[in-house]
Amino acid sequence: MNEYLFAPRDVFEHSTLIPSALKKDFLRAADKLIAAVIAQWHGNADILRLHGDCHAGNILWRDGPMFVDLDDARNGPAIQDLWMLLNGDKAEQRMQLETIIEAYEEFSPFNSDEIALIEPLRAMRFVYYLAWLIRRWDDPAFPRNFPWLTGEDYWRS
């Protein structure tokens, strides 16, 4: 929780990228999100080693799958890696998740209680990613590739 919620919250508080006129409201919204994630989090998850950024863009195919971009590898619930493979609308994601879990269970039992963690994990990823962008802003590639981050419209939304 610290790495994905509390440390990013501190980054937001000290960031000069968030327009000062919007910072108070943004921090209030971040605090509400953090409280909601904490309220929904439960300790029923089985913790194991994860890729941490497991989406289709980090799987290369040549003679079989090869996972790349392991800098986010960490411990957490299996669903953390599985939900990131989902795409499409809710119905498509539900079917995809059923298929992924069925395949997962060919190798290891899946704790279905973890499904309730998808939305909290999604929120945590969003908060963490935004703080990561802010931390990296001094890299010349970031303002060039993420120009929307300095726009007031982004922070207002």
Give residue ranges: language-model regions:
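Conserved ATP-binding subdomain of kinase catalytic cores across diverse folds
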Residues: M1-E3, D113
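An alpha-helical support segment within catalytic cores of ATP-dependent transferases
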Residues: Y4-G52, R62
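ATP/Mg2+ or Mg2+-diphosphate-binding catalytic cores
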Residues: T16-L17, A21, A131-S157
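Activation loop entry of protein kinases
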Residues: L50, M66-V68, Q80
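Activation of the activation-loop gatekeeper triad in protein kinase-fold domains
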Residues: D69-R74
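Active-site activation/catalytic loop segments of kinase-like enzymes and analogous catalytic loops
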Residues: A78-P109, R125-A141
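All-alpha amphipathic helical-bundle segments outside canonical DNA-binding/catalytic cores
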Residues: S112-R122
